[in-house]
Amino acid sequence: MATLAYSIEVEGLEDETLVVRGFHGQESLSNSVFLGQACYGFRYQMQLASRVSNLTADQMVDKRAELKLYRNSQLVQRVHGIVRAFSQGDIGHHHTFYQLTLVPALERLSLRHNSRIFQKQTVPEILSILLQEMGIHDYAFALKRDCVQREFCVQYRESDIDFLHRLAAEEGLVYSFVHEAGKHTLYFSDASDSLSKLPEPIPYNALAGGTMDTPYIHGLTYRTQAEVSEVQLKDYSFKKPAYSFLQTVQGTELDYQQTRYQHFDAPGRYKDDVNGAAFSQIRLDYLRRHAHTATGQSNEPLLRAGYKFDLQEHLDPAMNRDWVVVSINHQGEQPQALQEEGGSGATTYNNQFSLIPGHLHWRAEPQPKPQVDGPMIATVVGPEGEEIFCDEHGRVKIHFPWDRYSNGNEQSSCWVRVSQGWAGSQYGFIAIPRIGHEVIVSFLNGDPDQPIITGRTYHATNTPPYTLPEHKTKTVLRTETHQGEGFNELSFEDQAGKEQIYLHAQKDFDGLIENDHTTVIRHDQHLTVENDQFTQIKHNQHLTVEGESRTLVKLDCSSEIGGSLQQKIGSKAIYDAGTEVHLKAGNKLVLEAGNELTIKAGGSFIKVDAGGVHVVGSAINLNSGGSAGSGSGYGGKMAELPQGVDKAKTPQEIELAAVTPTQQSMSPLLKARQIEALKGPAPVCEVCEEAKGN
């Protein structure tokens, strides 16, 4: 008959300081619950005794410990971990009773809570950081699928262990432990064929009783139940807005159930087909993890969670196959540990386990992702020396106040999309938040991994363009010159009696009107050009001045007319030249007056009127020599043409959606009538009022 024995070693204590009275432990693939408490791979409650009555928590808690199991004096199993809890019980004549809880070093991550951002890292890389921060270096990954790098991954107000479980479950990773002398190794895998396998098969004994030298399994129950038969996930990416990202995965081994149990979910938390297909399969594996299970009991201490084994000698040949241990509970009793105070019972060991067939993949339960309660405040960041930093999509980098690891530069976040007031295909509104601006950040579906800027706010340093509340009636759009001093502005003053639209261009102001431009000014217009003005009218110009017209030219004035110049003056036409007036006609010059025509120079004159022609001078010379006087001749300058305005690029042609009657714009005829109505003196557009009435 086999003999069993248990012992425990605790870091810093002499061997055999403690003896094992009994233990009750649980192991599981990834996390589970044991006696109402979280079990992170394994958790053992141990009843101990010692002839030392003054052991303290300082000597026990957070120390490494190792439970050893012997069969026929041979070490067959060990459990290595750290002491999470320690308590002292009754003090007897020879022994003091103690209890301790043995857990993996991984449980230390449950005592850390954080918020931080990981960028451009895979899940194994992120998990490695979490483990190494706690001094855990005994870990390994055995993965069949390469995890895709995550652009932006946030640990948001959650413990390190919850964050680890969440990421691992998303990628289909489960963990278990390999126990060796003096250490335990955390082992991540994503497929059952990556798990270790016991070297020898374990026999099944349905009629077992008493104690046998050979370990065996008994009480095996196989269970089949209907589960989800199909998973369909969907998501969206702004980089491929027309692509559905729909992924569908069908279950296998469905002969015993209906195939119409579809599980649809969106968003699927992926942005490409590779991840979408993998996540869909992982979801299906999880939802079907209880479709084929088995439970049983044994006295084989080599059975551990995360191991595979072959069963043999079962009466049902289908059961003699490979199995994966999903979870197992161990119980051991050692009454003889108390020696003279102990009972006469033998040392015992047994376990109860749950299994899945070896070809199936066990998936951990997906952990709920932290939800952001509402919008957050962040600051736009970028490289030193830059004022505006964005990518081709108008996205910017931001820094959250809670991100204590950020340096407040372009590495602080991923590229974050910015909501704009209007966004179409190459048309709409665009205003890029600048470095240092405070923005309001929302999160798609409350997901901290998907921030989007939905607003901007002023604060004590970034103040409004005008002081408040003094200028509370102003609506302002003011920009700031990039890499310089100055601003552009369009503002509206709405104070009664002071209403105003103000436009300021720091440098140039260009306008391009493809058709008509109509302006009606009810009062004065003032125009000051501090340098040159150039105007070109390619067809006709009509100018009507119903009062006076005054022009002051302080230097020369040139006018060149390609055709005729005709002027009609209702009263007088008076020209006053300081030195000379020169009239020249290429063919003929006619001066005509209704009553009188006078030519006067140097005290002499010629006067023509109804009474005749009067010539008066100191001397009148007819054909007596001399020559005609000459004028200066034409010296006018040609007008220069104005600069053109570059036309904005026309949006690329796109296929427009069908327009319903309720979406139709007003008819072109109505627009034309409105323009004509605006040319009239009425203060209200009669055509507009008519349209409202209809």
From Swiss-Prot:
Protein name: Type VI secretion system spike protein VgrG2
Region forming the signal peptide: none
Gene that this sequence comes from: vgrG2
Source organism per UniProt: Vibrio cholerae serotype O1 (strain ATCC 39315 / El Tor Inaba N16961)
GO CC terms, sorted: extracellular region
Disruption phenotype: Mutants are unable to secrete VasX.
Intrachain disulfide bonds: none
Pfam families registered for this protein in UniProt: Gp5_trimer_C (PF22178), Phage_base_V (PF04717), Phage_GPD (PF05954)
Main function: Part of the type VI secretion system specialized secretion system, which delivers several virulence factors in both prokaryotic and eukaryotic cells during infection. Forms the spike at the tip of the elongating tube formed by haemolysin co-regulated protein Hcp. Allows the delivery of the VasX antibacterial toxin to target cells where it exerts its toxicity.
UniProt record similarity statement: Belongs to the VgrG protein family.
Main location, first listed in the record: secreted
Subcellular locations according to the entry: Secreted
Residues annotated as transmembrane: none
Keywords of this entry: Secreted
InterPro entries: Gp5/Vgr_OB (IPR006531), Gp5_Vgr_C (IPR054030), T6SS_RhsGE_Vgr_subset (IPR017847), T6SS_Vgr_RhsGE (IPR006533), T6SS_VgrG/RHS (IPR050708), Vgr_OB-fold_dom_sf (IPR037026)
